């Protein structure tokens, strides 16, 4: 297996343009996310360089651009705040350790080939937690948007402090933030071809703050340390280890989802197919290295990836070029960033938060499915007010329960029992003949489709509806999968029939279905001679074994079908 991503020089010009353009987009976003996280602008910048470089080098999506993203920043903001509050001296170092641990989780997910399962999550849950993350990012920008420091306590703390924030608003900084949002929102599309709106807003906001409001006390980034970052060795504390592990697992899983969803977008634009497991390994390596050098964790960024592709990027070389361009800018122009107003960065992050919210699905979710909409709203509320683990866990659980209920209801209709020719079951002429000759004494019990645990009740109900018969033919020809619970229900039906002296025949038990019945020792109730591959033969032998019908008091040949 190739260790590195797909890199060649046949598309050098396109990759060069894509990488440079993606770097221009990344610069203001990295600054904004670094400040928003509480780790500082430097952490955001180095996260953009390091995650982007290693994810591009070792990942499985040639055109993916990786960097700190809105969802990852929201989680890291909470991690940094909680660890710094618990240990002011080592909290930030432990937060970077969490980023490294998150990367190790991602590498493990990739090596275990769990990539294909990461995005197998109901869209209502994905939409809900992404929208919740967007709302959190918007709320967390309210304080710097109003020209003040972010209060402690995250979302709840910000909402509680909102009256005080509004009463002490700094109009100039709020004006700069509003101007930033306005430029990003309303910049004409034809201008965006020449310069990304985030960079335009960053430059204009900084120039205006210096030229028009230079004599005012405006909060700015301040000095950014020049030179390469120092090595941040992992720091652990016994009393914080459990929290760090949980935070790392959440951050790692969120990064996996974020990256692979963006990889799907890249596939649709380039008509290629990414390697999800390889991508997770690349993302993990990037985050381990970023945490090791004091950078924020990152994931696949939709905006940067789309811009890269639209500018001509087609191989991982574009991601490597982007990282190198950012590195040169950081080393050569770090001092210029010191004058950037925090309100401008808050405006950029605010707009990112608004964009993360899944407005398209929010507007029509209730038209698609009321239950799905309720799940999405519940996940949003839990994400914003409780935490991401509870939101995703509860959302996935409820969504899966509802899905299983629907599947069980559909599969229950495939459990049928008849004692004469019936339109519900497609029978051949011979099968109809033998059922008619059975005169109600032979019952055909048919199961079809995957038999999951929700169908067990239908099997029991159908079996309980049987009144009188001398022989039962269990047709499993169309059962590709027999779950444990459904197997036990079938075993119970066969055992009860045998105890009542009824002849039992099994048709079409092959593969996984047969192995499951063998493990449950169901065939102890059924002689080997009563196991058939052909339903017609089973019905014929069942009727012949019973002999001629002798009494008018024997069971009626009318249908005893019950369908669920």
UniProtKB/Swiss-Prot annotation:
Molecular function GO terms recorded: metal ion binding
Residues holding Na(+): 258, 262, 300, 302
Cell location: Cell inner membrane
Gene3D superfamilies given in the database record: STAS domain
Record: residues binding hydrogencarbonate: 69, 301
Residue ranges occupied by any STAS domain in the UniProt entry: 432-542
Outcome after substituting residue 302 to A: Alters bicarbonate transport
Residue intervals on the Cytoplasmic side: 1-11, 59-70, 113-122, 186-196, 270-275, 313-315, 358-369, 406-564
Protein keywords: Cell inner membrane, Cell membrane, Ion transport, Membrane, Metal-binding, Sodium, Sodium transport, Transmembrane, Transmembrane helix, Transport
InterPro entries: SLC26A/SulP_dom, SLC26A/SulP_fam, STAS_dom, STAS_dom_sf
Stored PROSITE patterns: STAS
Biological process according to GO: sodium ion transport; transmembrane transport
Function statement: Low affinity, high-flux Na(+)-dependent bicarbonate transporter. Involved in carbone dioxide-concentrating mechanisms (CCMs) that accumulate CO(2) and improve photosynthetic carbon fixation.
Quaternary structure (record): Forms homodimers through the STAS cytoplasmic domain.
Protein name: Bicarbonate transporter BicA
Name of the gene encoding the protein in the UniProt record: bicA
């Amino acid at each position: 297996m190739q260790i590195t991503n797909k890199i060649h020089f046949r598309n050098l010009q396109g990759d060069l343009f894509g990488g440079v353009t993606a770097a221009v987009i990344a610069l203001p976003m990295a600054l904004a996310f670094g400040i928003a996280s509480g780790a500082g602008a430097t952490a955001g910048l180095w996260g953009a360089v390091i995650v982007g470089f290693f994810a591009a080098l070792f990942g499985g999506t040639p055109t993916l651009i990786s960097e700190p993203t809105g969802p990852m920043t929201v989680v890291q903001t909470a991690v940094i705040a909680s660890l710094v509050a618990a240990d002011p001296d080592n909290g930030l170092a432990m937060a970077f350790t969490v980023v490294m641990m998150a990367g190790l989780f991602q590498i493990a997910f990739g090596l275990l080939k769990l990539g294909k399962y990461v995005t197998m999550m109901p869209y209502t849950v994905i939409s809900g937690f992404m929208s919740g993350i967007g709302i959190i990012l918007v709320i967390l920008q309210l304080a710097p948007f109003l020209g003040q420091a972010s209060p402690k306590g995250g979302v709840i703390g910000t909402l509680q402090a909102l009256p005080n924030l509004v009463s002490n608003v700094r109009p100039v900084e709020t004006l700069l933030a509003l101007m930033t949002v306005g430029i990003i929102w309303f910049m004409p599309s034809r201008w965006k071809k020449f310069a990304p709106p985030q960079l335009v807003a960053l430059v204009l906001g900084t120039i205006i703050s210096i030229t028009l409001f230079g004599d005012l006390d405006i909060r700015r980034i301040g000095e950014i340390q020049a030179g390469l970052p120092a090595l941040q060795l992992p720091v652990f504390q016994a009393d914080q280890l459990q929290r760090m592990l949980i935070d790392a697992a959440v951050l790692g899983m969120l990064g996996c989802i974020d990256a692979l969803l963006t990889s799907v977008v890249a596939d649709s634009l380039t008509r290629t197919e990414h390697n999800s497991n390889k991508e997770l390994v690349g993302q993990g390596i990037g985050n381990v290295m970023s945490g090791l050098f004091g950078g924020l964790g990152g994931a696949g960024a939709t905006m940067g990836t789309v811009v890269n592709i639209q500018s001509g990027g087609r191989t991982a070389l574009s991601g490597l070029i982007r990282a190198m361009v950012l590195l040169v800018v950081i080393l050569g122009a770090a001092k210029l960033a010191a004058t950037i107003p925090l309100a401008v960065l808050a405006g950029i992050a605010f707009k990112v938060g608004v964009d993360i919210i899944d407005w398209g699905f929010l507007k029509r979710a209730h038209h698609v499915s009321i239950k799905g909409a309720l799940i999405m709203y519940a996940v949003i509320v839990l994400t914003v007010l409780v935490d991401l683990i509870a939101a995703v866990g509860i959302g996935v659980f409820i969504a899966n329960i509802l899905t299983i209920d629907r599947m069980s209801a559909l599969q229950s209709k495939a459990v049928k029992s008849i004692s004469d020719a019936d339109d519900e079951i497609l029978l051949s002429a011979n099968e109809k003949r033998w059922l008619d000759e059975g005169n109600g004494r032979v019952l055909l019990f048919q199961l079809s489709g995957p038999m999951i645990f929700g169908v067990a009740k239908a099997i029991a109900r159908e079996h309980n509806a049987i009144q009188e018969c001398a022989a039962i033919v269990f047709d499993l020809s169309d059962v590709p999968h027999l779950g444990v619970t459904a197997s036990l229900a079938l075993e119970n039906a066969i055992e009860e029939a045998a105890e009542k002296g009824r002849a039992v025949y099994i048709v079409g038990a092959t593969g996984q279905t047969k192995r499951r019945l063998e493990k449950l020792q169901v065939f102890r109730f059924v002689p080997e001679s009563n196991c058939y591959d052909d339903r017609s033969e089973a019905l014929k032998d069942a009727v012949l074994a019973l002999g001629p019908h002798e009494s008018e008091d024997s069971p009626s040949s009318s249908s005893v079908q019950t369908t669920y």
